[in-house]
Amino acid sequence: MNTKQQLVFIMADYRLGLFVFRNDLRVEDNLALYEAAQRSETLICCFCFNPTQNKYGHYGIPAMGKHRFTFLQQSLKQLRTELEMRGQKLIVLTGTFDRILTELISERQVDAIFLSQHQGYYERLQLGLLQQRFPFLPFHETPNNTLFSEQELPFELADLPETFSQFRKKVEPLSRNFSVQPVNALPSLPKNISYPGFKAETLNELASDDFEGGERAALTHLTSYFSGESAGTYKQTRNALDDFSSSTKFSPWLAQGCLSVRQIMAALRAYETEFGENESSYWISFELLWREYFFWYALKHGKRLFAFSGLSGKSPKTSFYSERFQKWCSGNTPYPIVNACMKQLNATGYMSNRGRQLVASCFVHELSLDWRYGAAYFEQQLIDYDVSSNWGNWQYLAGVGADPRGHRQFNLEKQTERYDPDNEFIERWAGDLSGQPIDSVDAADWPVR
């Protein structure tokens, strides 16, 4: 550590800071970590993993499946390496968020908590309970996963536009320098650090899926994407069902925070400076604004993000049919394009945006199922699960969210003709199950003959 860095830490506001990683598993352009580094003489960096996520979740569906768990483990391993390169250490502790932090704060006599702003209702509820337990402890929650902070929005959060189009028209004119914040040095760990009563999680060596978790992999992909031709053809290819280069594929790293949306926008602006703006580069920023909108949408509406009636106040005319749900999950419906998409999801943890729209539309309209079960299954399976984008988009498709039309049904036959005219995708994922009935029993559980 050089003299300048020592001076910064000696003049710090707090003797011991605690930084809690959540959906911000990176060091570079981590504004919350940067604030913790500037204001803490010594620092503990931790991540709380609740193993019940692999067993329990909404509607009896485990919240985290194998693909996202593998990606998370890879991301944590890379984060640990990045921190060690800066003289720090990542402590991964197993247990509930509330119990771990309560004991850690008390036992280590932590002076301040630093973490990134989270849009999830339950994550905010957990943090609120912790703040009530320690009312005199400073909690510093930094906007870290959006393009704009709440103060930079041209409206109060309570006045967030009801539709994306209205939101986009208000925020697109905002002038913003999307520079990134390097974090080159971190305060040291406190001396004689130990964690009695905690179980430290071992990060195992795991085989890589199609996506490799971690900050280094994210930055490598970011550089590669804007160095090639894909960014110039994004608008034309983004709806492809099964081509890795057809869309940006930033979403898994964005979801875990291995990559910041500011880093993507900075790279996009650099690309436009070198090659010029075009329709495709605009559509990349357009899709990032969708993500931005759903972040603030979730923050504004809180628990209503998970409500059956959503924002509409009117419950959809759907229900829950166990057999239909299981067939949809396994890709065993009368709809080949849906089957192929679901089998792709189950095998890889990923599905194209177009595929997600088709299977969600089928779930709600053809199968007449409660949209929340579909959202919960996506939460389990998707490697790029993001609470606001996932549940917000499902509300949108179910007609109870931010869609001004209130009804978003896709004609599956026409969509197949348009996006898989030669049935290549369906054949690749064995989606054609001709003659497969929707039900084998009726509403009273009598066999259908």
From Swiss-Prot:
Origin: domain of life: Bacteria
A Pfam family hit: DNA_photolyase
Keyword Transcription on entry: yes
Details of cofactor binding: Binds 1 FAD per subunit.
Any one GO molecular-function label of the UniProt entry: DNA photolyase activity
Keywords: Chromophore, DNA-binding, FAD, Flavoprotein, Repressor, Transcription, Transcription regulation
Annotated ranges, domain Photolyase/cryptochrome alpha/beta: 15-147
Classification via SUPFAM superfamilies: Cryptochrome/photolyase FAD-binding domain, Cryptochrome/photolyase, N-terminal domain
Entry's Gene Ontology BP terms: photoreactive repair
Cofactors demanded by this protein: FAD; (6R)-5,10-methylene-5,6,7,8-tetrahydrofolate
InterPro entries with a match to the protein in the record: Cry_DASH (IPR014133), Crypto/Photolyase_FAD-like_sf (IPR036134), Crypto/Photolyase_N_sf (IPR036155), Cryptochr/Photolyase_FAD-bd (IPR005101), Cryptochrome/DNA_photolyase_1 (IPR002081), DNA_photolyase_N (IPR006050), Rossmann-like_a/b/a_fold (IPR014729)
PANTHER family per UniProt: CRYPTOCHROME, CRYPTOCHROME DASH
The family this protein is said to belong to: Belongs to the DNA photolyase class-1 family.
Function comment: May have a photoreceptor function. Binds DNA; probably functions as a transcriptional repressor.
Protein name: Cryptochrome DASH
